[in-house]
């Protein structure tokens, strides 16, 4: 049997990522391809069943886009490799069975089936091409595709991010990993939320609302704001927001609607608001600290640009991607207990270690900073946000775009300054609306 072409990692000069500033040193593509191939062949997409997403591909590809060379790419690998675990065993009989939609559905959410799904999607790509496979299993509107499309947004957007990297860098192997991650991810119950919000949006005759307005409504709707509780831990969305205020959050989120002729603006608004929640959710008297989950709203926002750039995705599906992303950002804001938002925390930020830097200096520093990939991802997403948001930051409707001008760089500097040289768990605050979590953040 011929080797799977979708199993091979081969980066090319034609697809080196968004938000680039300078070129990579010689040998960078070969080094990155080698590391990504080793990860693909040896490691599970989950290093832990709950919340244990393998970030090695994210980190390596982010550093590549930031202009890193072989040494910096190796640093990205080294910072993520210790926690990884091997792939589960392969069962060729199961791989064959996955061609049956009923057999496929029966194994959704089964992490031990990751390798089987990975091989299944690679086989499908070898036969049909990766665009056709993504279209069939995420965008075809079949019952199975509806579930997988929702699953892309599970786990704080990780399958969406993973597939997005694969599409951005034209790597079918990474796309197959992301689809297999989506298929095996545990569920937070967001499929029902998405479909109900979409149903209500379709029935609505009135105008929609901006995400800024809807964030305010989340914060002032007591049932939604208090739905997630600290003891919920990793199930703040499933048992908290969806479990205790599912009807209310669906009705609220349904009001974010994107007309097809305003697709670019809608995506830019979502990208801007993800950055707004990341930077503006601070606590008076405390040092700046970015919320871990709002950070994921931001890192995933870059892939709105990636998906919108794909000519093979229909306008209708692009609208759906933007709407679902914006609606889920509202859920995650509620899951963090809807902290007060004040953009002055970003506008007035005084950089520390990064004082006087521009984007180039920041990129260079991030390439060598010890991190699991989150820092590189958020900073690159912010640079992309600066570019796509700029046309909408003034003029009519500009109030829907609170992050403007040099605030993008300031927020990127804040991301660097507040995480540098800290253990991974201390780099971020894990729920900015929960007062007890600020106790470990230094006072000013």
Swiss-Prot record:
Pathway entry: Secondary metabolite biosynthesis
InterPro entries (UniProt xref): Questin_oxidase-like (IPR025337)
The protein's required cofactors: NADPH
Up-regulation conditions: The cluster is expressed in rice fermentation medium. Three regulators are located in the cluster (ptaR1, ptaR2 and ptaR3), suggesting that the production of pestheic acid is controlled by a complex regulatory mechanism.
Superkingdom: Eukaryota
Gene Ontology terms, MF aspect: oxidoreductase activity
Annotated EC: 1.-.-.-
UniProt KW keywords: Oxidoreductase
PANTHER family: BAEYER-VILLIGER OXIDASE MDPL, PROTEIN, PUTATIVE (AFU_ORTHOLOGUE AFUA_5G03330)-RELATED
Family stated for the protein in its record: Belongs to the questin oxidase family.
Purpose: Baeyer-Villiger oxidase; part of the gene cluster that mediates the biosynthesis of pestheic acid, a diphenyl ether which is a biosynthetic precursor of the unique chloropupukeananes. The biosynthesis initiates from condensation of acetate and malonate units catalyzed by the non-reducing PKS ptaA. As the ptaA protein is TE/CLC domain-deficient, hydrolysis and Claisen cyclization of the polyketide could be catalyzed by ptaB containing a beta-lactamase domain.
Protein name: Baeyer-Villiger oxidase ptaJ
């Amino acid at each position: 049997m011929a080797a799977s072409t979708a199993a091979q990692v081969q980066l090319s000069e034609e697809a080196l990522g968004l938000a680039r500033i300078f070129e990579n040193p010689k040998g960078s593509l070969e080094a990155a391809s080698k590391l990504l191939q080793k990860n693909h062949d040896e490691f599970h997409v989950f290093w832990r069943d709950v919340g244990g997403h393998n970030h090695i591909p994210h980190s390596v590809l982010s550093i590549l886009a930031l202009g890193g060379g072989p040494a910096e790419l190796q640093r990205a690998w080294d910072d993520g490799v210790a926690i990884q675990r091997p792939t589960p065993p392969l069962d060729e009989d199961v791989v064959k069975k996955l061609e049956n939609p009923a057999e496929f559905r029966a194994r959704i959410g089964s992490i031990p089936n990751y390798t089987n799904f990975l091989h299944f999607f690679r086989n499908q790509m070898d036969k049909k091409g990766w665009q056709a496979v993504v279209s069939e299993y995420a965008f075809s509107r079949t019952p199975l595709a509806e579930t997988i499309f929702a699953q892309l947004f599970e786990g704080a957007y990780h399958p969406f991010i993973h597939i997005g990297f694969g599409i951005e860098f034209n790597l079918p192997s990474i796309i197959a990993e992301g689809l297999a991650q989506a298929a095996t991810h545990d569920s937070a119950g967001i499929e029902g939320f998405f479909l109900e919000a979409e149903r209500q949006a379709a029935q609505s005759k009135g105008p929609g609302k901006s995400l800024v307005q809807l964030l305010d409504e989340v914060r002032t709707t007591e049932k939604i704001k208090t739905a997630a509780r600290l003891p919920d831990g990793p199930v703040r969305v499933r048992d908290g927001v969806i479990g205790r205020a599912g009807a209310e959050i669906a009705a609220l989120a349904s009001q974010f609607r994107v007309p097809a002729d305003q697709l670019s603006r809608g995506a830019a608004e979502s990208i801007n608001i993800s950055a707004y929640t990341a930077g503006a959710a601070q606590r008076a008297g405390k040092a700046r600290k970015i919320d871990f989950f709002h950070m994921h709203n931001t890192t995933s926002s870059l892939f709105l640009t990636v998906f919108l750039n794909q000519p093979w995705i229909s306008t209708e599906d692009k609208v759906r991607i933007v709407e679902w992303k914006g609606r889920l950002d509202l859920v995650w804001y509620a899951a963090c207990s809807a902290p007060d938002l004040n953009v002055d925390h970003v506008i007035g930020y005084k950089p520390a270690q990064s004082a006087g830097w521009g984007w180039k200096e920041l990129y260079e520093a991030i390439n060598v900073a010890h991190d699991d990939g989150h820092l590189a991802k958020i900073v690159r997403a912010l640079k992309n946000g600066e570019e796509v948001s700029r046309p909408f930051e003034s003029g009519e409707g500009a109030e829907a775009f609170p992050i403007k001008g040099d605030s993008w760089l300031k927020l990127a500097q804040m991301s660097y300054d507040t995480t540098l040289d800290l253990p991974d768990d201390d780099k971020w605050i894990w729920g900015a609306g929960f007062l007890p979590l600020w106790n470990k953040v230094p006072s000013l």
